[in-house]
């Protein structure tokens, strides 16, 4: 649904036994053939996008997502001179609601050990994301964006790590863009993640200078200041230089990379800890 100044969308899905691989003995994200997009928001800010990203569970899940986007009227006390954009998002993923069968006594040998009640939420919650993003242009040079994210993350299910507590995290982001002069802009991010589980609290700072339309240089530092083990309260600094041209981005980075799961477009992979140079090329077709 959409009309001037407001728009909304709702997505609901239910999948069961969609683990289609080139080698059926593999697991996690290895050798997947079919693409199963997650019905969750694809966050772009570092802490929300890289610490606890969600990927669809191919063995079965029920997922839903609701988006609401509205723009407050410009030249008003509540909308400001240029108007204010507000985006709300809610996403949820649950296990399947199933009815179990005893295969030994079942005369139908082709029947599975359970039947699925499609689109009904099972007892086990896999993931939940509630977030709001507010964007306001203050003047011709200054734009501010603020975000709040509340996450629930079932680490045992999503990452296959047994004995881990469910993650309950709050994330806040402040993004400030200032145009110094034509084709030159500086952007600063301040991010915080607070949780009592897993590795504890994180902070991230980003500063980026752009020479439009092609070049940019950036510095980012992640700090795991809330880790329960003082030996792991580490900084992860990284500097980057990039060039954009005709839908292609070439970027060279140097710094410390923490271990974890990184997702791009719903495709996730495990990345080991490293310290060194990285060269990446991203193309849009």
Give residue spans per PLM region.
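Exposed, low-structure sequence patches enriched in small/polar residues
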Residues: 1-285
């Amino acid at each position: 649904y959409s009309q001037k100044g407001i728009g909304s969308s709702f997505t609901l899905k239910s999948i069961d036994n969609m683990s289609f691989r080139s080698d059926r003995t593999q697991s996690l994200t290895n050798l997947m053939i079919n693409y199963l997009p997650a019905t969750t928001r694809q966050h772009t800010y570092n802490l929300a996008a890289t610490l606890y990203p969600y990927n669809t569970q191919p063995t079965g899940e029920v997922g839903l997502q609701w988006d609401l986007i509205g723009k407050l009227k410009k030249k008003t006390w509540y909308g400001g001179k240029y108007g204010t954009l507000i985006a709300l998002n809610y996403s949820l993923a649950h296990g399947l609601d199933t009815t179990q069968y005893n295969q030994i006594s079942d005369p139908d040998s082709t029947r599975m050990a359970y039947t699925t009640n499609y689109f009904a939420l099972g007892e086990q919650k896999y993931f939940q994301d509630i977030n709001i993003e507010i964007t306001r242009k203050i003047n011709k040079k200054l734009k501010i964006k603020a975000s709040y994210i509340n996450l629930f993350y079932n680490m045992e299910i999503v990452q296959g790590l047994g004995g881990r507590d469910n993650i309950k995290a709050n994330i806040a982001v402040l993004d400030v863009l200032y145009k110094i002069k034509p084709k030159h802009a500086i952007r600063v991010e301040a991010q915080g993640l607070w949780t009592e589980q897993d590795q504890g609290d994180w902070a991230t700072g980003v500063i980026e200078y752009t020479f439009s339309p092609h070049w940019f240089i950036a510095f980012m530092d992640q700090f795991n200041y809330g880790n329960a083990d003082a030996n792991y309260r580490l900084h992860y600094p990284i500097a980057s230089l990039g060039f954009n041209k005709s839908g292609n981005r070439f970027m060279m980075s140097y710094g410390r990379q923490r271990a974890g799961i990184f997702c791009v477009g719903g495709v996730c992979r495990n990345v080991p800890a490293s310290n060194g140079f990285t060269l990446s090329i991203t193309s849009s077709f």
